[in-house]
Swiss-Prot record:
Subunit structure: Interacts with S.clavuligerus beta-lactamase inhibitor protein BLIP.
Lineage: Bacteria, Pseudomonadati, Pseudomonadota, Gammaproteobacteria, Enterobacterales
Induction (free text): Increased expression in clinical isolate strain 15571, in concert with reduced expression of a 45-kDa outer membrane protein, confers increased resistance to ceftazidime.
EC number: 3.5.2.6
Biological source species: Klebsiella pneumoniae
Identification of the protein by name: Beta-lactamase SHV-1
Amino acid sequence: MRYIRLCIISLLATLPLAVHASPQPLEQIKLSESQLSGRVGMIEMDLASGRTLTAWRADERFPMMSTFKVVLCGAVLARVDAGDEQLERKIHYRQQDLVDYSPVSEKHLADGMTVGELCAAAITMSDNSAANLLLATVGGPAGLTAFLRQIGDNVTRLDRWETELNEALPGDARDTTTPASMAATLRKLLTSQRLSARSQRQLLQWMVDDRVAGPLIRSVLPAGWFIADKTGAGERGARGIVALLGPNNKAERIVVIYLRDTPASMAERNQQIAGIGAALIEHWQR
């Protein structure tokens, strides 16, 4: 009897650890969907091999929101590599060209901005006018979609400009991607010969320098880990992030997370994405 009591005591002593441990990634995603009363799409992909490690609704469509800006700047860099564009080229614009949330471009009406500066503003600060000015250089939404088709992405599509593309209507395929397609496209841009090595480094550096992603995966990143990311936010609860992660300050995996159709606040959406990121990282470290 004494032996049995000791066994029970030993078992109970382990329960707090089980209760407080982070759930497995898919368990966390299911929990997030329940708490958000919405949909979550996610994929975790090995950067080197392209192998899918974790996936949930990875082939369902979600609004891209501002995550499209990474692909946009990839298209711009492809034009630079082809000799059709220069990062140093100055673009001038007018007050009527500005749209909501243009924290960088609104300060340069007098002097304009270079193509490279516009890419930096679009990715690091999610500047919407910068994105529209860059979209014009690649042929608008149709031109960017054509670029995606050229590199083998037959799913992702951009149909509108900022800020209309963030409408996120249920059942609307416009301006959407799937987690799997976005991850595969990002991998092509950063590892294949679609871009020169120099352009790959530049695109990655812009993502490293992201200044508006603090409340998401960056908030749960262990010391010494690498992250390069781009976030997006839209109407009807849409939120998203595309990221490269890895220990020892090395990019090893692509993580794409999208939310949609949730009444949750921005803070709640950020917290859920951070929670999914934390579960992925903990599972990775085991």
